[in-house]
Regions:
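N-terminal alpha-helical interaction blocks
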Residues: 1-23
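Intrinsically disordered, low-complexity regulatory segments
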Residues: 4, 21, 61-62, 69
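Short, flexible, mixed-charge glycine/proline-rich loop motifs
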Residues: 16-30, 39-46
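Eukaryotic N-terminal intrinsically disordered, low-complexity segments enriched in Ser/Pro
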Residues: 18-22, 101, 109, 125-127, ...
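Cys/His-enriched microdomains
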Residues: 29-34, 47-52, 352
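Cysteine-rich micro-motifs
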Residues: 44-60
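Long, charge-rich boundary regions
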Residues: 63-137
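Catalytic-core elements of nucleic-acid end-processing and repair enzymes
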Residues: 174-177, 186-188, 192-368
Length: 368
């Protein structure tokens, strides 16, 4: 079905809110407003300023070039025959010193979403043989296309503020679009994924954003805690930090069903405190594992190399002696910062490791 053309207000929004008018600044601090053509003086260190003649907010570019262009996407969300439609337009902006800027708006893609979450894509042809997934051929028609990864990469955060939603999306808690999230993925998740719907309805937008970015990966571990959070009216403001905090609690064996842990008053402070505890816990575990490995390998090393124990070479300054235990291998590796212990040289039957010292200070490790 052919959708109606955009009204002038929606077209004007794309030209004024999606692309940024440019102010070209020379080395003398003279800024040319490419929107109205007037020249004014401004040496601000900021990257933006307001033209005193036309009131346009300008993006300052310190350059000598005369031609400028921008290409951005604009999205409009509407409905048609009970289907949710996301219309994607390419906004092309061309400006030249001394001339009126030119704007073009071309519809390049439509995502049609059914109430059951299934969707299809109408799009123009794309040029092949380039490294860009959005080299649109404007002369081609909007036609039904096979779904490819490229269409999922084409989305924008510049969405026209007035949106129309199908009743099913409203029933699932949707009232607006989420910044930083592909709108198609967001709508489909609300229609098909109960967890996404729940997060939206309980007001956990940051958790929903994090959930969608990770495609729900590993959220089974967090879901019982999310229920506790919802029951206690706690709002997670930094979802990534909160999930990392729960991972630390889980590894430390804390109760993830307790509001005491999952609803911290100061998330950053509690996160940092438990990360310190976790690092200490991991170090103690590594020491225990290392000690167990040393005890396990000690007997075999003693049997294999006992006949060399006590062997040493020395003069007035240097002393070279055989390492007589696995624990000495560990101490040697730590002191000399090499892999004599970590690579298991004490297990090698065809090698003999010696340590060279001067006045008891290690200077070299020798392999025979």
């Amino acid at each position: 079905k052919k959708l109606p053309n955009l009204p002038p207000a929606q077209i004007g929004w794309a030209f004024t809110h999606v692309v940024e008018p440019i102010g070209r600044r020379t080395s003398k601090g003279e800024i040319t407003c490419l929107d109205c053509g007037e020249v004014f003086h401004n040496t601000t260190k900021h990257k933006q300023c307001v033209c005193p003649h036309c009131g346009t907010k300008l993006l300052i570019e310190d350059t000598r070039k005369l031609n400028f262009k921008q290409r951005e996407y604009a999205a409009y969300i509407t409905t048609s025959d009970g289907l949710q439609v996301i219309r994607i337009f390419m906004v092309d902006y061309y400006a030249k010193i001394g001339k009126t800027p030119r704007y073009y708006l071309n519809e390049v893609m439509q995502r049609w979403i059914a109430p059951n979450g299934k969707f299809c894509t109408m799009a123009r042809l794309r040029a092949w043989g380039t490294r860009y997934c959005d080299s649109w051929i404007y002369s081609s028609d909007l036609e039904l296309r096979n779904e490819t990864w490229a269409y999922g990469q084409i989305y924008t955060y510049d969405v026209y503020p007035r949106i129309n939603l199908i009743p099913e999306l409203k029933q699932h808690g949707c009232r607006k679009v989420l910044h930083d999230i592909n709108t198609t993925d967001y709508f489909v998740a609300l229609l098909m994924d109960n967890r996404a719907e729940t997060l939206m309805k309980i007001g956990q937008e940051e958790l929903l954003r994090h959930y969608l970015k990770r495609s729900g990966w590993n959220f089974d571990r967090y879901w019982p805690s999310i229920r506790i959070v919802a029951r206690n009216g706690y709002i997670v403001k930094d979802a990534s930090l909160w999930c990392d905090y729960l991972d630390a609690l889980w590894e430390l064996g804390k109760d993830l069903h307790s509001p005491k842990y999952v609803c911290p008053e100061n998330l950053r402070e509690e996160h940092d405190r438990y990360v310190v505890k976790l690092n200490r816990h991991r170090e103690e575990r590594r020491k225990a594992e290392r000690e167990a490995l040393i005890l396990e390998c000690e007997e075999a090393y003693q049997q294999a190399k006992a006949r060399f124990f006590g062997l040493s070479f020395h003069d007035e300054k240097i002393c070279i002696h055989v390492l007589e235990s696995v624990r000495e291998f560990f101490a040697e590796g730590e002191a000399m910062h090499h892999c004599v212990y970590s690579n298991g040289y004490y297990r090698k039957d065809d090698s003999l490791i010696l340590s060279a010292t001067i006045d008891g200070k290690r200077i070299e490790t020798c392999l025979l």
